[in-house]
Amino acid sequence: MGDSILSQAEIDALLNGDSDTKDEPTPGIASDSDIRPYDPNTQRRVVRERLQALEIINERFARQFRMGLFNLLRRSPDITVGAIRIQPYHEFARNLPVPTNLNLIHLKPLRGTGLVVFSPSLVFIAVDNLFGGDGRFPTKVEGREFTHTEQRVINRMLKLALEGYSDAWKAINPLEVEYVRSEMQVKFTNITTSPNDIVVNTPFHVEIGNLTGEFNICLPFSMIEPLRELLVNPPLENSRHEDQNWRDNLVRQVQHSELELVANFADIPLRLSQILKLKPGDVLPIEKPDRIIAHVDGVPVLTSQYGTVNGQYALRVEHLINPILNSLNEEQPK
């Protein structure tokens, strides 16, 4: 024990702390520089689920808007839907070019305000094509406001976009898309209460010939959160609209099915003994019926008269028989 007694210098070092080692971080303990303040009101929310229904809506909207642009510009555009981006609003806003057409919309009955954003490149492409241009003389972005002519083209495109977006939502959850107003500066939009609030941003890339443009649909996550379960797990078969398409296709295929129509001219009751006595040249008298019933697969479908037309035997339809009602009548107990 005597050999383990500390010297006075060592005791002073323990009491006062070793100035040479006091700044060295202790393993496993975070230093002050690694600690960041946490504000629960501004931290971004983590959305891990894939919004499958929103992807379906975006694809349908792209098809609708493509047809609308074709009717407007008389040129066939190619619209590609980008990946859905879930990001803070300030990240979305800082990447917008100037000038930018910002259109505020409501999706009733959802609470909140969304954005339909047309980039200047898309606006200039639409104006150029609408007035017969082919893109050889691109318009330069100079930070100016849009002209009255450009604004009129924007309004026509926006009307097509809002109609298409409303139709795209009908299959999942019908919403009324309502235009609020337009802005050119993002600071006047205020679709979120904080720059760090999460938004759901979908970019759309438009190609017309060799020219490309872009527009975005940006929705606050708080706006569509009431539909979160529906957007994550879309209904089976995606929509009633697709169910109707399936029915229509089935009806068309059934209508093109080939059936054999059989018309019995007469029935002659004979015994087996009489049939066995028949020989070539025998004559079996029959009575010509006033009407003949035609069958499909044993089910009566129509009554007709028998005759000739242009030298060919033919049937003239007199009355259509409902095969379902006829079958039900036959199945009823007598």
Swiss-Prot record:
NCBIfam families: fliM_switch. Residues 15-40 are annotated as: Disordered. FliM is one of three proteins (FliG, FliN, FliM) that forms the rotor-mounted switch complex (C ring), located at the base of the basal body. This complex interacts with the CheY and CheZ chemotaxis proteins, in addition to contacting components of the motor that determine the direction of flagellar rotation. Pfam families: FliM, FliMN_C. Belongs to the FliM family. Keywords: Bacterial flagellum, Cell inner membrane, Cell membrane, Chemotaxis, Flagellar rotation, Membrane. The gene is fliM. It comes from the Bacteria. GO terms for biological process: bacterial-type flagellum-dependent swarming motility; positive chemotaxis. This is Flagellar motor switch protein FliM. Its main location: membrane. GO terms for cellular component: bacterial-type flagellum basal body; plasma membrane. It is found in: Cell inner membrane; Bacterial flagellum basal body.
